[in-house]
Regions:
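N-terminal pre-ligand scaffold of iron-sulfur
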Residues: 1-66, 101-114
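FAD-binding core/adjacent interface of flavoenzyme oxidoreductases
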Residues: 60, 73, 82-106, 110-133, ...
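Beta1-alpha1 glycine-rich phosphate/pyrophosphate-binding loop at the start
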Residues: 128-201, 240, 287-310, 500
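Glycine-rich Rossmann-fold phosphate-binding loop(s) that bind the pyrophosphate
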Residues: 136-140, 256-257, 278-280
Length: 511
C-alpha cells in the first residue's frame, strides 16, 4: 500500500498535447491543476480520469481498458471512464473525471467535472424492505452496507459486529501495517463519522445468539431481539486454534482482527526470535512482516513446499527461496507438538526458541449461527446464484458462503477479501429484490517483501500447469488447467495478462 506525494508527471494538459501523441487505445498520464490525470483514447473519444486507483493508489495507466472502463493493474478494481464510478471492489470510491476538448489537432483538459451522485438502484418488483440487518463487520458486511447507501436505499441498516473496531482493511493487517510500513490511520475502511452520516447503525462488541427465520428476528446475547425484513450473514471465518499444549500462552497469537495485529506488533517490539506455524498465505505474509522488523523468523509447516497445493511446485520453490533470501528459516514436513514457555517443540524431535509464536494453520467458516437457524450448511452456508440461503430473505456472503461458481461449474467457497466485498455488493442488490446472479471471477493477491502474487479464478483439482516466463526472474504467468480448460491464473509482474485472463473468464461465463 503506497501513497505518492511526488510532483505530477507528464505534460501540462491545460496547455494541450497533439492528438497524434495519443493513439487509438492508448493511455497517457499528464497533469492538470496539480493533479495527475490519465488520458485514454477510444476511437474519436478521449476520456480524462484520475490517474490512480482509489484503493491502494495503483497506476491506472498500467491497467486494462475494457469497453468504457479501466481496470487497476494491482488488485483488479474497475472504474467507469464516463462517470468515474467504482464499478467493482476493492475500490469503493470513484476517480475524478475532467472535461476534454479537441481543437486544432490537439487535446486539452479543461476542468474537473462535478462528481455525479451514484445512480439510485432501480426499483425491482415488490415491496422494498424497510429493515436490513447485517451480521458481520468484515469485507462483505461493510461492502453491503456501503453499497446500499451508495445506491440510495433509504431504509434501516443495522450492522452487528463482535469486533471491537469498526470495519478495517483486513489484508493490511498481515502486510504493511504489521510490517510497520503503514500507519494505523490507513487501516479503517471509513472514519467513524461515515456510519452516523450514512445512518448505518454499527453495533460493535455485539454477539448474535440466534435467528428466528419464521418471525424474522435476530436474537442478541443481551437478550434483545432485532426484527428484519432482509438479513445478510457475513460472519466470515476464524483462525483455527492450535490443538497442542501451551497454545494458550500470552506470546502465542493468531491473526484476524486489528486487535490481533496490534498485539503481535506490541510483542514484536520486545522479541528477538519468532516462530510462525503454517506456510500458507497468512503465515508467510506474517513472516515477511516480522523480517521487516528485523526479527529472526522460523516457519514450521507440514508441507513439502509452501503453497504447493494452490500455486504448484515451481512457484512453491520460488516462494521458499524468496523468503530464505530474506533470512527466513524453514522447518518443513514438521509440526509443533507443544509450546513450553519459549520453547516450541517439534513433532520431528527438534526444539525452537521463540519470544513470539504466530499460528497461521488455516481458518474455518463461522457457520454456527446459520446451523442453529436450520439453514443448509455443507462446509459453508449453501446459497443459490443470488446468494440467498435456504431460508427466504436470508442471504450469505463472504468467507462463509458456498455458491455455484459458473466458471468452474462447482459449488465453491473461497476466503478472499475481494470476493467477499463483491459478494456483499451483489447481496445488497438482491436483498432489495433484484435477481442478479453473482458471477464474479475470484481474485486475490498476496505480498511477500516487494513481490506481489496475483491469482485469478479458482483452480481446485487442477491436472495441468502451463508456465509462461521465468518464475526465478520474477516475471511469469502460470495457467492452472483441468481437462485442458484454464481454471485459474497466477502471476508475478504480469499485471495486464492477469487482467486479460480475468476478462477472458468473465466472457467465458457469459457465452
Amino acid at each position: 500500500m503506497a501513497q505518492d506525494h511526488a510532483q505530477p508527471s507528464g505534460p501540462d494538459l491545460a496547455r494541450g498535447i497533439a492528438l497524434a501523441e495519443l493513439a487509438d487505445g492508448g493511455k497517457l498520464v499528464g497533469h492538470f491543476g496539480g493533479e495527475e490525470v490519465l488520458l485514454l483514447r477510444r476511437g474519436t473519444e478521449i476520456f480524462a480520469v484520475g490517474a490512480h486507483c482509489t484503493h491502494y493508489h495503483g497506476p491506472l495507466v498500467d491497467g486494462l481498458a475494457v469497453d468504457d472502463t479501466i481496470r487497476c493493474p494491482w488488485h483488479h478494481a474497475c472504474f467507469d471512464l464516463r462517470t468515474g464510478e467504482a464499478l467493482r471492489a476493492p475500490a469503493l470510491r470513484p476517480v475524478a473525471c475532467w472535461s476534454v476538448e479537441q481543437r486544432d489537432g490537439k487535446i486539452f483538459v479543461r476542468g474537473k467535472q462535478a462528481q455525479p451522485k451514484p445512480k439510485p438502484v432501480g426499483k425491482p418488483p415488490g415491496e422494498t424492505p424497510k429493515r436490513i440487518v447485517i451480521v458481520g463487520g468484515g469485507a462483505a458486511g461493510f461492502a453491503a452496507a456501503e453499497g446500499l447507501r451508495r445506491g440510495q436505499y433509504e431504509g434501516s441498516i443495522v450492522m452487528l459486529s463482535n469486533d471491537d473496531a469498526a470495519p478495517v482493511d483486513r489484508p493490511n493487517l498481515s502486510k504493511d501495517y504489521l510490517a510497520g510500513k503503514a500507519p494505523e490511520d490507513w487501516v479503517p475502511l471509513r472514519p467513524d463519522s461515515f456510519y452516523s452520516k450514512n445512518r448505518i447503525d454499527l453495533r460493535l462488541n455485539t454477539n448474535v445468539t440466534g435467528i428466528d427465520a419464521r418471525s424474522r428476528e435476530v436474537a442478541l446475547a443481551d437478550g434483545s431481539k432485532l426484527p428484519y425484513d432482509r438479513l445478510l450473514l457475513a460472519t466470515g471465518a476464524e483462525p483455527i486454534r492450535l490443538p497442542i499444549p501451551g497454545a494458550d500462552q500470552t506470546h502465542v497469537f493468531t491473526l484476524r482482527s486489528l486487535a490481533d495485529s496490534r498485539a503481535i506488533i506490541e510483542r514484536a517490539g520486545a522479541s528477538r526470535r519468532a516462530v510462525v506455524l503454517g506456510a500458507g498465505f497468512i503465515g508467510l505474509e506474517v513472516a515477511a512482516s516480522l523480517r521487516a522488523r528485523d526479527i529472526e523468523v522460523h516457519v514450521v509447516a507440514p508441507d513439502t513446499r509452501p503453497m504447493e497445493r494452490i500455486l504448484g511446485p515451481e512457484m512453491g520453490d520460488f516462494v521458499r527461496s524468496l523468503h530464505e533470501e530474506h533470512g527466513v528459516v524453514f522447518h518443513l514436513e514438521d509440526t509443533a507438538s507443544a509450546i513450553d514457555g519459549k520453547q516450541v517443540k517439534l513433532k520431528g524431535g527438534g526444539t525452537l526458541e521463540a519470544d513470539l509464536v504466530v499460528a497461521g494453520i488455516g481458518v474455518r467458516p463461522r457457520t454456527e449461527i446459520a446451523e442453529r437457524a436450520g439453514l443448509n450448511v455443507d462446509r459453508g452456508v449453501i446459497v443459490n446464484g443470488h446468494l440467498e440461503t435456504s431460508a427466504p430473505g436470508i442471504f450469505a456472503a463472504g468467507d462463509i458462503a458456498r455458491w455455484p461458481d459458473p466458471h468452474s461449474g462447482e459449488n465453491i467457497r473461497v476466503e478472499h477479501w475481494v470476493v467477499a466485498e463483491r459478494q456483499g455488493q451483489a447481496a445488497a442488490l438482491n436483498m432489495l429484490g433484484h435477481r442478479e446472479k453473482f458471477s464474479g471471477v475470484p481474485f486475490f493477491w498476496s505480498q511477500h517483501y516487494d513481490i506481489p502474487i496475483n491469482y485469478v479464478g479458482h483452480g481446485e483439482n487442477w491436472d495441468e500447469l502451463a508456465i509462461e516466463g521465468d518464475i526465478a526472474a520474477r516475471d511469469c504467468l502460470l495457467r492452472f488447467k483441468r481437462n485442458g480448460r484454464v481454471l485459474a491464473v497466477a502471476s508475478i509482474f504480469r499485471d495486464v495478462e492477469s487482467l486479460q485472463a480475468e476478462v477472458s473468464m468473465e466472457r467465458d461465463i457469459s457465452t
